[in-house]
Design a protein with these regions (language model features):
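Non-catalytic, usually N-terminal nucleic-acid engagement modules in DNA/RNA processing proteins
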Residues: 1-184, 201, 315-318
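Short acidic/polar active-site loop segments enriched in Thr and Asp
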Residues: 55-56, 141, 234, 287, ...
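Conserved, mostly hydrophobic/aromatic
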Residues: 25, 58, 93, 135, ...
Length: 399
């Protein structure tokens, strides 16, 4: 049995909608994946994500779960699904992006990356092989290859050197992943064989995605794409964007890269982005997204609405008895006013962050639902124009 099944259902220009099936859920694409860094989407209960918001897939963070509680504990407790009680699909990143953001705390070699934990300063090591082993322990449906993410403004030579390392690491990731899926866990890092966890056979249960790098250099993006596809993966991701480059550069890279990616595999844009970014990336052929913005902004009073972003801390909302977004049908918008949410935030109540994060996730997931419907109807181009024009109303008014 294949670990995932992917079929394109409809197209409108480069935009496409499809069905991604895993062992745990059927996922309609384009899809936004809430980020569950520590095995939880910050401030939001899984019941809400599953029952109200109908999120079919979320992200787990290999770096953070590697450090705490550790793969051995998660393996012993039956994998991240059982440990966290998340019942639907999981995609885990490789840990590469987080490690390479620790510029002053890491040492890069051909073998992998030695770094100091941001928790206690202890020395740790991640390599393609270790990353695959940790993600096997997490038992996610989709595993990401281990890569190096250069800065967005990296020069050509530095980016090319990084790309070549990423290509070698991609092959090592593929080889170790295949060993684990075929033979089970035989590494000294993790002592519990996959076939004994919860009485389930884990062989062949995960899919592996490769990552295309190259910063803003289109020639290198093409080379990375060709080398990654040459290795062969179940899906392909565009990495190394939204890391400081100009937005126009990001859009140029997506527009150049996405249409050249295999048509018969999901296309994933990592770590991006705003609602506008999602719409523009779908327009250029992307299927999958993740970003921390809905919950990160929610914790600081930032709400995404159909007319642009607002900050509930603004004094103008002190007596506003309207919902966060009149066009949103989420439980937060049906029940609570802007004035009440502002009061909660000003009072330092934890509930404020939870409610605004919940709304933001509902907004992102609903946006993707509207995108899918417009593609099916052959109306995505008009939807894109109308959506973006409406989205800029508050931004233009300075709210």
């Amino acid at each position: 049995m294949k670990p995932i099944d992917w079929q394109v259902a409809a197209r409108d220009g480069n935009a496409r909608t499809g069905i991604l099936r895993t062992r745990r859920s059927v996922i309609e694409t384009p899809v936004f994946m809430p980020v569950g860094t520590q095995g939880t989407v910050k401030g939001v209960r899984f019941e809400w994500l599953e029952q109200e918001l109908d999120a079919r897939i979320i992200l787990g963070n290999t770096y953070h779960l590697f450090l705490r509680p550790g793969p051995e504990i998660i393996r012993q407790l039956g994998g991240l699904h059982k440990f966290s009680t998340w019942n639907r699909s999981l995609l885990t990143d490789s840990g590469g992006f987080q490690v390479f953001s620790l510029t002053d705390l890491r040492k890069l070699t051909e073998e992998g990356v030695e770094f100091r934990s941001h928790l206690d300063g202890s020395k740790k090591f991640l390599s393609p092989e270790v990353s695959m082993e940790v993600q096997a322990a997490l038992d996610s449906e989709i595993v990401m290859a281990f890569d190096e993410c250069p800065p967005g403004d990296a020069g050509f030579e530095l980016t090319k050197k990084s790309l070549e390392l990423t290509a070698r690491w991609a092959k090592r990731s593929r080889d170790r992943f295949d060993e684990l899926q075929t033979n089970g866990m035989d590494s000294g890092l993790l002592s519990v064989p996959p076939t004994t966890v919860g009485g389930a056979d884990l062989s062949g249960r995960q899919a592996l995605f490769g990552i295309i790098q190259g910063a803003g250099h289109l020639e290198l993006r093409k080379e990375s794409l060709e080398r990654t596809v040459g290795i062969g993966f179940d899906g392909y991701a565009i990495g190394g964007l939204s890391v400081g480059e100009e937005k126009s550069v990001m859009y140029d890279v997506i527009e150049f890269t996405a249409p050249q990616m295999p048509d018969d595999a999901p296309r994933y844009l990592m770590g991006v982005g705003t609602p506008e970014d999602l719409i523009e990336a779908v327009h250029r052929g992307v299927d999958m997204f993740d970003c921390v913005l809905p919950t990160r902004n929610g914790r600081t009073g930032g709400a995404f609405t159909s007319r642009g972003r607002i900050n509930i801390r603004n004094a103008k909302f002190a007596t506003d008895d309207g919902p966060l977004d009149a066009d949103c049908g989420c439980s937060v918008c049906r029940r609570y006013s802007r004035a009440y949410l502002r009061h909660l935030y000003q009072a330092g109540e934890i509930l404020a962050a939870t409610l605004i994060s919940h709304h933001n996730l509902a907004f992102f997931l609903d946006t993707m639902g509207q995108v899918r419907q417009s593609i099916k109807l052959g109306r995505f181009s008009q939807f894109r124009l109308d959506y973006l024009n409406k989205l800029r109303e508050n931004d233009a008014s300075g709210v």
